[in-house]
Curated annotation (Swiss-Prot):
PANTHER family registered for this protein in UniProt: UNCHARACTERIZED PROTEIN YQGE, UPF0301 PROTEIN YQGE
NCBIfam families: PRK00228.1-1
Protein's name according to its UniProt entry: UPF0301 protein YqgE
Family from the record: Belongs to the UPF0301 (AlgH) family.
Amino acid sequence: MNLQHHFLIAMPALQDPIFRRSVVYICEHNQDGAMGIIINKPLENLQIEGILEKLKITPEPRDSAIRLDKAVMLGGPLAEDRGFILHTPPSRFASSIRISDNTVITTSRDVLETLGTQQQPSDVLVALGYASWDKGQLEQELLDNAWLTAPADLNILFKTPIAERWREAAKLFGIDILTMPGVAGHA
């Protein structure tokens, strides 16, 4: 089982404060473990433009039609000071890894320098931090029914409003997660 380019969708009973009601996009999954980015946990009061300001990056030439007020996600509990940019191709940046035909992850500054310009990738999600599972750990969590899995959907990844991503991702599995046991007050 390879879950690269899949969503992990937290089951209602999962109460860990970071992963509760989360959707994790799996960037890498192999015999050594897995790595992913939470795509629906916005950091409070931090948008892309704030990251650019902190790094002293000024988009040149600025395209005012491109919004930089999108929320930055808490990508996971590890390396929360490190940026991960999920985006659609191209992958011409210094530190890019192609996850699928339509998804790339980049960790280098050069992708940030394109944000707000005509050079930026068409779809972008910026996160600080990532989630990781050791060998066999994710598989055990799946056996313990902590997660649902579904092939990733780019509309959910990049376009669905953040507050709706958990429910919409579960619909890929064919269920309304709000009606499942463990979701108090929503049945």
